[in-house]
Every structure is written in structure tokens, then in C-alpha cells.
Amino acid sequence: MKRNEEKILLLAIVGTLETVKNGGITIDEAEKFMFSPHMISELKVKKCNEKIIDLITKGCELEDIASLLPERLGEVIDELKKEAIMIIKTYEEYNKTFWIEE
């Protein structure tokens, strides 16, 4: 998987988490977009950064946290966003004009 594709994926993870936290989508919907065993399998095949795969694996636990420890859900989402941002910081700045044209 290309580094810029991984960075875009990380940006999508942060956005998905923020949208769940603010009620824009449900955890169930976030699982369909991002946090699923299927996504993990696909990313492993594409040789995605293991840190991103680990992050998505943790995201797969959001439904359990919501049902067992609902008072911690916001905190866990914030922790996952911080982790994603820390990974983003390890990537070089994108300096081409438009990623969509690659």
C-alpha cells in the first residue's frame, strides 16, 4: 500500500471517529465503513502499516465499549483519534497538487 494511501486512510479514521463521537453516524455504520474484520483482512493483503491495522482492530471494539462501558466511549474515541494523529505525524508532508489524480 502506498504511503499516501495510508495517510488518507488515517485521515478517514480520524473523521470516522469524530463523526461517531458527535452522533453523525452510528458505531454500526462506522463498522461498515472502517472498523471491521473484513477491512483488516483487506489491509493485510495490501501490506498496510501494522500500526494502522492495530488501530482499526481497536476500532472494532467500539460497539463492545458502548454496551459495556458507555461512560468511557468518548474517552476511548479520543484515545484512538490521538493514536491515529500520532501515526499521521510519522508520514512525510504531501506536496503534490491533488492526491486524487495519482
Predicted regions, residues:
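Acidic, Ser/Pro/Thr-rich low-complexity regulatory regions
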Residues: 1-102
